[in-house]
Swiss-Prot record:
This is Aminomethyltransferase. The glycine cleavage system catalyzes the degradation of glycine. The lineage of its organism: Bacteria, Bacillati, Cyanobacteriota, Cyanophyceae, Synechococcales. Belongs to the GcvT family. The glycine cleavage system is composed of four proteins: P, T, L and H. One of its GO terms (molecular function) is aminomethyltransferase activity. Its EC number is 2.1.2.10. It comes from Synechococcus sp. (strain CC9311). PANTHER family: AMINOMETHYLTRANSFERASE, AMINOMETHYLTRANSFERASE, MITOCHONDRIAL.
């Protein structure tokens, strides 16, 4: 089957990227090596081609009120220049996908209209887009594919902001986490949508720009010594930060309460949204499972769907697992009954027929100082 390629595909290969198939795209899994890339983001700066992600522009009359029908988070908490993380839900309160919603403020063409930018996961982009269009598109509201021939680039790490300030001549000290702005970067033709967001547990930005500018910025960042990073390091970085991966740590059969995302559910707001009734019942009854952090003894790595054992019985499953390059030990996220989700609970994970001791620990495993 033919794979989609991002506008940075050839540049990734030229930079040493080892390409793999991911969610219908040919993407770099690593460049210099997972460990080196992971360390670069934790100590300096790294960049990721994330142009496979879906990007939608919702523009028209009262887009927040319209999108509010689909998410449990109060969208009126954010204003122009701000963003929030949330989830799309089905009628059962299960998670269809997670997403970031950016408020771009009044439309440039019609000040009576407003604009939202929505970033969705690559694997869910087609179904998410159809779902959102089904419920939102009307005469005075459009849902547009914003990413066509565009580049989405993540620049992450403790030195990322300083580098971007130097390349743009701008002071970003007042740009808060989940804030966004339009930035002029030296040598690029058009202003760059710049959001202080990321999927690594480090400070940094995600940049949306036209293909030609994206290619130029990639080369510029390489010349500045920024480490190109692949999907492998992106996964170990997000796992250390206990950030969810859709399809592993949550899915359409998992509610936000079961995924440890109850803080996204604002039942105190009056707005009706798909799945609200199911979540009201779930909030009253309490979740039947919880997402927890595990640290394992030894060096064996727990992978997705490995059984979690307690007193000889299977009590849950690992949702994500890896070796932690920062902590130098195996870590995992797992779904367990609430009674076993308490910190310090000792369990085992079955790895290739052997039981490996594990302990429930606090999430995230890593938090930047």
């Amino acid at each position: 089957m033919d794979q989609n390629c991002t506008p940075l595909h050839d540049l990734c290969i030229a930079a040493g990227g080892r390409m793999v198939s991911f969610a219908g795209w040919e993407m770099p899994v690593q460049f210099s090596g997972l460990m080196a890339e992971h360390k670069a983001v934790r100590s300096d700066s790294g960049m990721f081609d994330i142009s496979h992600m879906g990007v939608l522009r919702i523009e028209g009359a009262n887009p927040k009120d319209a999108l509010q029908q689909l998410v449990p988070s109060d969208l009126h908490r954010i204003g122009p220049g701000q963003a929030c993380y949330s989830v799309l839900l089905n009628e059962q309160g299960g998670i269809i996908d997670d997403l970031i919603i950016y408020d771009l403020g009044p439309s440039l063409l019609d000040e009576s209209h407003e604009t939202l930018l929505v970033v969705i996961n690559a694997a869910c982009a087609e179904t998410d887009t159809a779902w959102i269009r089904q419920h939102l598109e009307r005469a005075d509201l459009q849902v547009l594919d914003e990413k066509k021939d565009g580049v989405l680039l993540a620049l992450q790490g403790p030195k990322a902001i300083g580098l971007l300030e130097r390349l743009s001549g701008s002071d970003l000290s007042e740009l808060p986490r989940f804030g966004h702005c339009s930035l002029n970067i030296h040598g690029l033709q058009a202003p760059v949508f710049t959001a202080r967001t990321g999927y690594t547990g480090e400070d940094g930005v995600e940049l949306l720009l036209k293909a030609d500018d994206g290619r130029q910025l990639w080369q510029l960042l390489l010349e500045e010594g920024v480490t190109p990073c692949g999907l492998g390091a992106r996964d170990t970085l997000r796992l250390e930060a206990a950030m969810h991966l859709y399809g592993q740590d949550m899915d359409a059969a998992t509610t936000p309460f079961e995924a440890g995302l109850g803080w996204l559910v604002h039942l105190e707001m009056p707005a009706l949204f798909i799945g609200r009734q199911a979540l009201e019942q779930a909030a009253e009854q309490g979740p039947s499972k919880r997402l927890v952090g595990l640290k394992l003894q030894g060096r064996s790595i727990a992978r997705h769907d490995y059984p979690v054992i307690h007193n000889g019985a299977t009590v849950g499953v690992v949702t994500s697992g890896s070796w932690s390059p920062t902590l130098q030990e195996p870590i995992a996220l797992a779904s367990l009954p609430p009674a076993l989700a308490k910190l310090g609970t000792e369990l085992s994970v079955e790895i290739r027929g052997q039981l490996q001791p594990a302990t429930v620990v606090k999430r995230p495993f890593y938090r930047r100082s």
